[in-house]
């Protein structure tokens, strides 16, 4: 799988821009503010249906324009397809595959990407929600059933919480048995898939981390269920916990049990890297996890996703960059990388961007 062509019309600061990346490494060079990250953002948007920089699609549309479009041509199994995202200011967005309208849930998994940006440090330092989203997006790109179940689960949690709020207003007892069953079934499946994914990543990530650093450190990933030594995948366990917590949940109008409360923990030589790792160790750990995510997607689908590296030159030292480039070249992974110094491209193709 690889990107053949990207065209942006009225996106961010770009009026009409087309690039044709190489199958290997393409380095997007230019001064700050010229629009390098906008290209990475558009490719990622074509993959998952949203930006990694903003929750407001109006921010994507060029100032002064009423609409903007992203057109991405990708090749999979020797067949080319065209994804189009059309955004209209104040009216939302629409997705198309080969000119046929599709929904966002149908977009996920068509063209797969893995993203690494300077903000990725939040994957270790940030709130549990960031780590859950990372894991959910990874699995959703390879499993439509997982994404559907995740949507249904989140709706059931919202309905249960709404029933508690309504009961507080009416003075009546909340009827949540139906939502408890939906939540329990969804939770059991979601946690099972998460555990399977974490186990597969955990087999790869120590080897990748050692490859990048050349050191004999051991990086590992653990799935953490609040208050439990081990995560549970049984429907009956979730039903029991929801019942036991119902009185407290009713008072607080929230649901305190389930995968929406779980977390990931990253350990370096058995110690929590968020607390004990240096910033350099944390950045290398995140990159190792991103590469293990790529290996997981290849294992599940048969092909690597496209790797998007934004401003990687500021994140890694020369030795780690060289190790990364060697790995990407060896595995023949299409990579788009941004930076201000074209010398970082090595043997890759350079696309020069300029301020207008």
Regions found by a protein language model. Name each.
Residues 47-124, 128-130, 139-142, 146, ...:
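Nucleotide-state sensing region of NTPase/ATPase domains
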Residues 44:
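Helix-to-loop junction immediately C-terminal to a conserved catalytic motif
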Residues 78-79, 86-90, 319-356:
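C-terminal lobe/lid and adjacent interdomain/linker elements of RecA-like ASCE P-loop ATPase modules
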Residues 1-31, 170-306, 315-319, 323-334, ...:
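Conserved NTPase motor "head" modules and their coupling/switch loops across ABC/AAA+ ATPases, GTPases
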Residues 310-312:
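Walker B catalytic acidic pair
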Residues 122-123, 130-170, 174-177, 181:
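Long, charged N-terminal accessory/stalk domains
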Residues 36:
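Conserved lysine of the Walker
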């Amino acid at each position: 799988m690889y990107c053949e062509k990207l065209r942006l019309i009225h996106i961010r600061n770009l009026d009409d821009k087309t690039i044709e990346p190489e199958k290997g490494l393409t380095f997007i060079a230019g001064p700050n503010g010229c629009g390098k990250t906008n290209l990475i953002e558009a490719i990622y948007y074509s993959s998952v249906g949203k930006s990694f920089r903003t929750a407001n699609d109006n921010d994507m549309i060029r100032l002064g324009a009423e609409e903007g479009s992203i057109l991405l041509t990708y090749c999979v199994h020797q067949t080319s397809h065209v994804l189009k995202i059309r955004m209209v200011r104040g009216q939302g967005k629409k997705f198309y595959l080969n000119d046929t309208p599709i929904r966002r849930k149908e977009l996920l998994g068509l063209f797969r990407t893995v993203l690494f940006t300077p903000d990725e440090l939040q994957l270790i330092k940030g709130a549990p929600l960031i780590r859950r989203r990372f894991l959910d997006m990874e699995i959703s790109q390879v499993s439509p059933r997982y994404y559907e179940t995740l949507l249904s689960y989140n709706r059931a949690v919202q309905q249960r919480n709404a029933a508690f709020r309504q009961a507080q207003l009416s003075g009546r007892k909340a009827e949540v048995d139906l939502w408890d069953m939906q939540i329990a079934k969804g939770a059991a499946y979601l946690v099972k898939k998460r555990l399977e994914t974490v186990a597969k990543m955990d087999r790869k990530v120590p080897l990748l981390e050692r490859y990048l650093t050349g050191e004999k450190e051991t990086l590992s990933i653990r799935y953490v269920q609040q208050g439990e030594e081990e995560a549970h995948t049984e429907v009956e366990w979730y039903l029991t916990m929801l019942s036991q917590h119902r009185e407290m949940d009713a008072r607080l109008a929230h649901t305190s049990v389930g995968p929406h409360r779980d977390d990931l923990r990253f350990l370096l030589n058995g110690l929590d890297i968020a607390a004990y790792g240096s910033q350099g160790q944390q950045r290398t750990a995140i990159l190792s996890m991103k590469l293990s995510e790529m290996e997981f997607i290849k294992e599940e689908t048969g092909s690597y996703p496209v790797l998007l590296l934004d401003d990687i030159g500021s994140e890694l030292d020369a030795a780690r960059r060289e190790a990364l480039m060697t790995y990407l070249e060896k595995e023949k992974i299409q990579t788009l990388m941004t930076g201000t110094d074209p010398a970082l491209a090595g043997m890759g193709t350079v696309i020069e961007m300029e301020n207008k």
